């Protein structure tokens, strides 16, 4: 039926989930203990709101549920959430037959089973050119900021929404020293709870703090089981993840921060004077870490839209292939439709192809790179042969220095009091209880190390040299020095091995990721309950970290250009990004096979905040463009109309997904030739002339018409051009990459081009 469960194709294209790393459902989180042991949590999505009165909307949700259950009391007990601000819908405990029945209601677009998923700085801003940092931090000092920071007052009127695991409010990064009044448009609030006092813990920096647990608890009989859920029944952060991401996006200045002396410097967020609103939807569960219920996440989105945040930073991910029953991206669509940029993580499932998640065209999807900083550990063998190895933050050797005997684990020797060498290819054995001091583990470059600082990780080449030394020495020894901090060359940035890669497996013509930002060994504040925290700070790695980097930059752009749409800001980032490092070195992609990074690794490139502030031209998108995407993806008129809250018809003929006005061109199946269009908006000098510069992919001829864009007046800031791609390949090919740049001599507006040839048989 048209109004019940959507077609399988539509559901698949809607499948965007809301939390990082794993999609494993937790066996202990069931509906057992509920009034009906067969009941589960479902989200009933009704589309755009029909009116602005939230009380009337909630009443209508109860009426619909009462009609289904034939009991006002049962409807009240079944209802978990009413979504009434950004969109219309509710979450409720239903049996599968009840879910099927309500899905057939003419006002229901989709019924979505609730899911439980697992949660996936000093140097950053200097590295990206967003500096200098003030030398004084008193309220009376005038911060010596320049460029984007200066022109936006460091984001003082902006509001960053962070959907995560909450906040540790006592952290110095949330001090409100020198901040003016809270923006008048703010409609949110702080909610008190366990060890969180709204009056005491919120201030002019942390202006919002809410928490959502009903969806999670409903899957466990409605109980907050302290044995299983080791968390606070409030916005207070038990895992440290939310505190870390909020710091990166908008933390205040904190000088002399470090992790055991590493990465020492001033910690601050991208928009250090922006206000932070924390929406806790993720909870610390024993054995699983941070987990989140999609019903809770929807409510966080709903409230954030109502509260009028400027950006939503959600360090999230999804399973690959994406689950056809997860349509949580709908909440993000409604946020974007209200002008809120939603910044999402590319995921940590790299470095293989087609591992990218968060692929909807309205999301700003972020990959992770290293910084021009490393933390090398010095390994000195007894023959004075020396090696330097660098690890991710989670497995740094912070000392003190050790000097021990050295042995290979596979040898029949006593390892007590020694450092041992292992290879991951030989299935490392358990060393518990054997008296081993440290382990040098030689591993594949694509493997992400476990967070254990008793391990020193290296590659096979160095491991083989160490093994040869052991084999040829009667009493081998080793000295391992604590990691040190190295910045600048030769520590040039690379796309991290764990960062998920394109191409997009759901909509191949939509390039993902959009952009890359630093996400490896990022220093930020954490909860003191975070294992290994040092004076309230810790180094973490992941696209969880690169996402708030971009969120902080977005609020600066929003402050500078308040009328820009989320799509315009994404375009500004993509078209001005670095395709080499800030120092001019090539950007490589880490993984099993090291290579030069391409658009499937980093989208447009490494984010360049200062350039993004003045992009010259932008590839803008609005609701009409998203409608064309939905039409090209197979959505029917009825479904689109309900999502938008107004009658909508797809154009005839159906739009091509190649014509979606993205700041990129991706042609997944070029047979002979194809022509597509793009539209640019002049946001630079009113009178401008841009000329096309084409770098065609191998074996592909690109032709642009016209080759010159002339902007003559403020009334004519929008121009359209066409691009014809023609292949000379005679057999099927992989993807080849190029670019299209519009230049006026000052601005270089570059979009990546990715083309794969497919020959019909």
Swiss-Prot record:
This is Subtilisin-like protease SBT3.15. GO terms for cellular component: cytosol; extracellular space. GO terms for biological process: proteolysis. Residues 134-613 form the Peptidase S8 domain. It is found in: Secreted. The gene is SBT3.15. It comes from Arabidopsis thaliana (Mouse-ear cress). Belongs to the peptidase S8 family. The keyword Secreted applies. GO terms for molecular function: serine-type endopeptidase activity. InterPro entries: Peptidase_S8/S53_dom, Peptidase_S8/S53_dom_sf, Peptidase_S8_Ser-AS, Peptidase_S8_subtilisin-rel, Peptidases_S8_3, S8pro/Inhibitor_I9, S8pro/Inhibitor_I9_sf, SBT. Residues 22-120 form a propeptide. Residues 1-21 form the signal peptide. The keyword Glycoprotein applies. Glycans are attached at residues 151, 197, 256, 384, 636. Pfam families: fn3_6, Inhibitor_I9, Peptidase_S8. Residues 41-119 form the Inhibitor I9 domain. Its EC number is 3.4.21.-. Keywords: Autocatalytic cleavage, Glycoprotein, Hydrolase, Protease, Secreted, Serine protease, Signal, Zymogen. The active site is at 164 (charge relay system), 241 (charge relay system), 544 (charge relay system).
């Amino acid at each position: 039926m048209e109004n019940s469960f959507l077609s399988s194709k539509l559901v698949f294209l809607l499948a965007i989930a809301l939390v990082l790393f794993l999609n494993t459902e937790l066996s202990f989180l069931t509906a057992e203990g509920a009034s009906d042991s067969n009941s589960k949590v479902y989200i009933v999505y009704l589309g755009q709101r029909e009116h602005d009165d939230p009380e009337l909307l909630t009443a209508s949700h109860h009426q619909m549920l009462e009609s289904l259950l034939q009991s006002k009391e049962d409807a009240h007990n079944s209802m978990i959430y009413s979504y009434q601000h950004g969109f219309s819908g509710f979450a409720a405990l239903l049996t599968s037959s009840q879910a099927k029945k309500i899905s057939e209601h003419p006002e229901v677009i989709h019924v979505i089973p609730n899911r439980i998923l697992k949660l996936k700085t000093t140097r950053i801003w200097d590295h990206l050119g967003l500096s200098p940092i003030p030398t004084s931090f008193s309220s009376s000092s005038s911060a010596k900021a320049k460029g984007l920071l200066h022109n936006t007052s460091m984001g003082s009127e902006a509001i960053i929404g962070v959907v995560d695991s909450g906040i540790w409010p006592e952290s110095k990064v949330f001090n409100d020293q020198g901040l003016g009044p809270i923006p008048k448009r703010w409609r949110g609030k702080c909610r008190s709870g366990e060890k969180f006092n709204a009056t005491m813990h919120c201030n002019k920096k942390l202006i919002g703090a809410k928490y959502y647990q009903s969806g999670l608890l409903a899957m466990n009989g409605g109980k907050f089981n302290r044995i299983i859920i080791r968390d606070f029944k409030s916005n207070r952060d038990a895992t440290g993840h939310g505190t870390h991401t909020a710091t990166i996006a908008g933390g205040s200045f904190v000088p002399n921060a470090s992790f055991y002396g590493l990465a020492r410097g001033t910690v601050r967020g991208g928009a250090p004077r922006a206000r932070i609103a924390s929406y806790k939807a993720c909870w610390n569960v024993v054995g699983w870490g941070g987990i989140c219920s999609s019903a809770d996440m929807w409510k966080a989105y709903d409230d954030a839209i109502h509260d009028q945040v400027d950006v939503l930073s959600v360090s999230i991910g999804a399973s690959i292939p994406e689950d056809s029953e997860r349509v949580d991206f709908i909440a993000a669509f409604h946020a974007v439709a209200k002008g809120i940029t939603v910044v999402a993580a590319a995921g940590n499932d790299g470095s293989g192809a087609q591992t990218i998640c968060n692929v909807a065209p309205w999301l700003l999807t972020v990959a992770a790179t290293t910084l021009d900083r490393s933390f090398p550990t010095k390994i000195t063998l007894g023959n004075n042969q020396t090696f330097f190895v660098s690890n991710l933050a989670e497995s740094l050797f912070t000392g003190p220095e050790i000097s021990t005997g050295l042995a290979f684990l596979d040898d029949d020797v006593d390892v007590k009091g020694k450092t041992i060498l292992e290879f991951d290819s030989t299935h490392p054995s358990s060393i518990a209880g054997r008296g081993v001091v440290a382990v040098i583990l030689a591993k594949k470059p694509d493997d992400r190390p476990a967070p254990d600082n008793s391990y020193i990780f290296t590659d096979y080449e160095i491991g083989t040299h160490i093994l040869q030394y052991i084999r040829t020495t009667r009493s081998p020894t080793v000295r391992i020095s604590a990691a040190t901090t190295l910045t600048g060359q030769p520590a040039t940035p690379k796309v991290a091995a764990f960062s998920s890669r394109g191409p997009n497996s759901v909509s191949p013509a939509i390039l993902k990721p959009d952009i890359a930002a630093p996400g490896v060994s990022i220093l930020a504040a954490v909860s003191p309950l975070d294992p290994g925290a040092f004076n309230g700070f810790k180094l973490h790695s992941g696209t969880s970290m690169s996402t708030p980097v971009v969120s902080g930059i977005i609020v600066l752009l929003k402050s500078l250009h308040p009328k820009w749409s989320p799509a315009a800001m994404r375009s500004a980032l993509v078209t001005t990004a670095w395709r080499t490092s800030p120092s001019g070195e090539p950007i490589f992609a880490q993984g099993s096979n090291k290579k030069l990074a391409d658009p499937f690794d980093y989208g447009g490139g490494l984010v360049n905040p200062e350039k993004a502030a003045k992009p010259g031209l932008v590839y803008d998108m609005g609701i009409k463009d998203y409608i064309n995407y939905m039409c090209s993806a197979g959505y029917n008129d009825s479904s689109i109309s309900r999502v938008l809250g107004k009658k909508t018809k797809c154009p005839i003929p159906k739009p091509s997904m190649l014509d979606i006005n993205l700041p990129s061109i991706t042609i997944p199946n070029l047979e002979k030739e194809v022509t597509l269009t793009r539209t640019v908006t002049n946001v630079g000098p009113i009178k401008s002339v841009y000329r096309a510069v084409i770098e065609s992919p191998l074996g592909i001829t690109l032709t642009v018409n016209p080759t010159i864009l002339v902007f003559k007046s403020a009334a004519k800031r929008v121009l359209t051009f066409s691009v014809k791609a023609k292949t000379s390949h005679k057999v099927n090919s992989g993807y080849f990459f190029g670019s299209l740049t519009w230049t006026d001599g000052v601005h270089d507006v570059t979009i990546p081009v990715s083309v794969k040839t497919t020959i019909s048989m």
